[in-house]
Regions:
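Short, well-ordered coil/turn segments that N-cap beta-strands
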Residues: 8, 31, 54, 70, ...
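Alpha-helical structural signal in soluble globular domains
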Residues: 24, 28, 47-50, 86-91, ...
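Beta-loop-alpha module in the N-terminal Rossmann-like domain of NAD(P)-dependent dehydrogenases
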Residues: 54-114
Length: 149
């Protein structure tokens, strides 16, 4: 469900590194930060107020079950990525998951399988790949300028 004007309605699980996701959603003209979730509810409430989120949860299952969300960011400790991502996908949400994708290959494969089954987008936040320096290094490697890598 998109809000009027077509903006994406986002929820963020984990407000440590997830605070960067919150800032991004809150500042983007086509996004609205709706909900945040963290075990540290006081910190979650403070950041929700700072970035304009309406809902604060301690349990990620409450956040992913919200009909008001289109996308969920998973920015929790690595061992929780698969569990929380799969729950969000099963709830019909697109997911942006922090790196690493998972701590075990089987978990990563299950995440991809669930995204395909749900016909939802799953993206792993490998933001350095968009960094101009990283892109230039990739081009040089592809041209063989740096020898065998």
């Amino acid at each position: 469900m998109k809000k009027s004007g077509g903006a994406l309605r986002a929820g963020v699980i984990g407000v440590g590194i997830g605070s960067h996701h919150m800032r991004g959603y809150a500042s983007h003209p086509r996004c609205e930060l709706v909900a945040v979730c963290d075990l540290n509810v006081d910190r979650a409430k403070a950041l929700a107020e700072k970035y304009g989120a309406t809902y604060v949860f301690r349990d990620y299952r409450q956040l992913v079950s919200m009909d008001e969300l289109d996308i969920v960011s998973v920015a929790t400790p690595n061992y929780l990525h698969a569990r929380m991502t799969i729950a969000a996908l099963r709830a019909g949400k697109d997911v942006l998951c922090e790196k690493p994708m998972a701590t075990r290959l089987g978990d990563a494969e299950a995440m991809v399988a669930e995204a395909r089954k749900a016909k939802k987008r799953l993206m792993i936040d490998m933001s350095y790949r968009f960094n101009p320096l990283q892109q230039e290094m990739r081009r040089r490697i592809q041209r063989g300028e740096l020898g065998e890598v």
